């Protein structure tokens, strides 16, 4: 299995904070609120702006209650459910994210189509998992820092979900990272896991998103800043995967991920 690229080797990490980056982000915002996009919708850019779109299907996997739906909601700038309700079927969410490529200095609009399915539905209906995996470009594997069992279940999840697709992008995400006082997953265990599996690992918080001045509306720009590391990480891994598949890059970079 090819090693993933080093962080920041494909995508310019903090480009979204630059003046140019903020101009592109404006197309996925409306008055500092995130725009919602349906399956057939896309951001509207000025006629003078020519930009390529790279589309990817991403299946989100993990035990019930680890925060799969909450993660997708955060990435899309939607309200995170306060009370946990298991997803009853397959739920798809589209997220657009502009990013600048380091090698070419070009901006690409990444379109991520997240597929989320409740654990009970996956067990009850045999066709659910194949449907989620069909034509997938990447898998996100979630665990909760407050649920030791979800972390110990990761190897089984990786084998069960991605065992037949060893070459696809696989990323591990630890949710509820802000609840460090109650963590059941110490740093040494994370280090051992990363050394064994050589997969990118990101941490996300479970705190509610910041609000605009009205106290009710989610602050779209603040939400993007909070999740940019995950969106950039996804873009980096997927773009690198495409370049390797096209024969434009070697399958194993010289350096391991940091």
From Swiss-Prot:
A Pfam family for this UniProt protein? Ras
Q: Which GO terms describe its molecular function?
A: GTP binding; GTPase activity
Kindly indicate whether the keyword Transport belongs to this entry: yes
- The residues that the entry says bind GTP are 64-65, 67-70, 82, 84, 87, 176, 178, 206
Biological role: Required for efficient primary cilia initiation, regulating a late step in cilia initiation. Plays a role in the final maturation of the mother centriole and ciliary vesicle that allows extension of the ciliary axoneme.
Q: Which family does it belong to?
A: Belongs to the small GTPase superfamily. Rab family.
Specify the protein name: Ciliogenesis and planar polarity effector 2
Species of origin: Mus musculus
């Amino acid at each position: 299995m090819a090693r993933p690229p080093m962080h920041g080797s494909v995508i310019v990490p903090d480009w979204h904070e630059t003046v140019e980056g903020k101009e592109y982000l404006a197309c996925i915002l409306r008055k500092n609120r995130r725009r919602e996009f349906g399956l057939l919708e896309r951001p509207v850019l000025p006629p003078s702006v020519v930009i390529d779109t790279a589309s990817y299907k991403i299946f989100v996997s993990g035990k019930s209650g680890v925060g799969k739906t909450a993660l997708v909601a955060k990435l899309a700038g939607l309200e995170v459910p306060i009370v946990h309700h298991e997803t009853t079927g397959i739920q798809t969410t589209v997220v657009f994210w502009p990013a600048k490529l380091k090698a070419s200095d070009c901006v690409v609009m990444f379109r991520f189509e997240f597929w989320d399915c409740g654990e009970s539905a996956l067990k009850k209906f045999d066709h659910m998992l194949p449907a989620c995996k069909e034509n997938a470009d990447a898998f996100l594997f979630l665990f909760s820092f407050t649920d030791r069992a979800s972390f110990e279940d990761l190897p089984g999840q990786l084998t069960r979900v991605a065992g037949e697709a060893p070459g696809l992008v696989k990323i591990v995400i630890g949710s509820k990272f802000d609840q460090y006082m109650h963590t059941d997953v110490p740093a040494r265990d994370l280090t051992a896991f990363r050394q064994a599996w050589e997969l990118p690992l990101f941490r996300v918080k479970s705190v509610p998103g910041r609000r605009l001045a009205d106290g009710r509306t989610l602050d779209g720009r603040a939400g993007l800043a909070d999740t940019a590391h995950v969106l950039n990480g996804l873009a980096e891994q997927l773009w690198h995967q495409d370049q390797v598949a096209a024969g434009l890059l070697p399958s194993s970079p010289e350096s391991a991920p940091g």
